[in-house]
């Protein structure tokens, strides 16, 4: 076969082969007499080909998809849009579980039966759809449900476990929902939107032709055409509409060359910066820096074009609270708000008044009950009170079994309205003095009672307060407890109290007359012991003997607990051995210097003699007792006192003795002749510094550091 024959048989039809062009010869028949026949097609075939070419170019027929959907349910579910629309339709009808179960069966069929997830998936499908879904279980046959249940329960799993159930559900969907879906509004709206949407490759209508020397009259037709386009755009989704709108804008744009603009300005004698002078190197009126600036703009847009800016609406609606209302509604709302504010302020004022009242009551209570009630009281003084001292005195002086007042066996506590002084340390010796003669009559009895009271009050410690009838409180001296301030009694209460005391004294005087005993000399100590023993044999409570004498009030439990706690703290602070030695030495001295033994109360009936005052020394001056340390903690009125065997202390050793630790400042009292008081408080901050002494004691003020 020669190539020349092939070339002669193929006509020169150009680079494109068309159906109307001559066909090449059959291979092997190139040398035969060949008559080229022109291939002709009928009009119907040509029309079909034209439709085919139009579809190949992008104009796809819109009804082809719906025709496929209408053939079978499987074709509908194979299409993504069709499955989505069908799911929406079933969910609207309350049958969404049917389609979900159908897809779950497809997914289970694709799984491997040997995998561990397969059994879990089968159980989940059975539990969620076959067992609990009424839409699925109601359309399955009982035998099918039983078969699936046994397979899942016995772990007889294979790919065909749910095939029978899937076929029954598919048959139910075809009979109940498939036909109605094709005729539903959802399907029709989707078809209408696809038909009305133009293809992406379709060009715009373009500008109408304007003939010269004629007036344009086709504006109406052009506007009607644009109306159709706008209506078509309204049915297109926003994404497609945005893309088509950009293409239409590009179609309608018209660019005039810069040269023609420049020529028109020159011909019209319009002088601008570009047309006035061309010596700056610009071409056609475009400045040379314009291109560089344009490139920079494009770079910035490409770099920052995806920055999301906040959406700011053009119109901002005011909130509902800002909307204008009628004066009546506004007045009602304002009244309610003001009433709430007024109630709140009234409640705050009442609360402030209550707090102020409580504060005043606390201040009054602090004034009535000072902190001196917690002062250390010796053990001997805790067993007696002024009334017991008076009873002992009368029994010794009158030598009669007088009716005794009740004695307080509890620790000393402070009671309002009762005569109870606070006792101090250092006075433990007593002596016997001459007894006065007993007067006659009521006036003499009252005189005797007043003398007894004055004698008892003179022998009490300096720290004891006066009876409640006095107006001026007793000032405590150095080394004694503070005075206890109480409110005075009313005149009726004072008169009743005096009457009870006088009646009791008269009864004692009558008993004395019956015994006919003379009182002329000083009673020796053995006789005093007998008298006290005889007095102690009487009942402790006066109301058992004399109903006219009112009983004492019960002691306060809180005060007793506070005193016990304070004593425990003091016992822990001071070494027990040192304390016992000091007490023992004091008792030995008193026994050696006093010829008469004293009762356990430790108080005398009359004034101490000058010899005993000089012979007895305070317990603080006993030799070998150590150094006394007195300190005030953070502004407290009552000081704390501890003792140590060391002759001197440093600041570090002093801090170890304190029960309260923390960041504090320490000021120690020392002698100084720079001031009139000859004393000054000096701050000591160094740990190794030796503490100064004042009157053979260490006196310190402990303050909180700021």
UniProtKB/Swiss-Prot annotation:
Region spans: Disordered: 278-298, 400-482, 585-605
Superkingdom of the source species: Eukaryota
DIX domain sequence ranges: 624-706
One of the record's GO cellular component terms: cytoplasmic vesicle
GO terms (BP aspect): cell development; negative regulation of canonical Wnt signaling pathway; positive regulation of proteasomal ubiquitin-dependent protein catabolic process; regulation of centromeric sister chromatid cohesion; regulation of Wnt signaling pathway; Wnt signaling pathway
Residue span, RGS domain: 72-191
Keywords from the UniProt entry: Cytoplasm, Cytoplasmic vesicle, Developmental protein, Wnt signaling pathway
Annotated SMART domains: DAX (SM00021), RGS (SM00315)
PROSITE patterns in alphabetical order: DIX, RGS
Segments of skewed composition (Low complexity): 453-462
Molecular function terms from GO: beta-catenin binding; I-SMAD binding; molecular adaptor activity; protein kinase binding; ubiquitin protein ligase binding
Positions of transmembrane segments: none
Record Gene3D superfamilies: 1.10.196.10, 2.40.240.130, Regulator of G-protein Signalling 4, domain 2
Position of the signal peptide: none
Biased composition (Polar residues): 402-412
Subcellular location: Cytoplasm; Cytoplasmic vesicle
Chief location bin: cytoplasm
Assembly and oligomerization: Interacts with dvl2/dsh via DIX domains in both proteins. Forms a complex with ctnnb1/beta-catenin and gsk3b. Also forms heterodimers with mouse Axin1.
Function: Regulates the wnt signaling pathway by interacting with dvl2/dsh, which displaces gsk3b from the axnr-gsk3b complex and thus prevents degradation of ctnnb1/beta-catenin.
Protein name: Axin-related protein
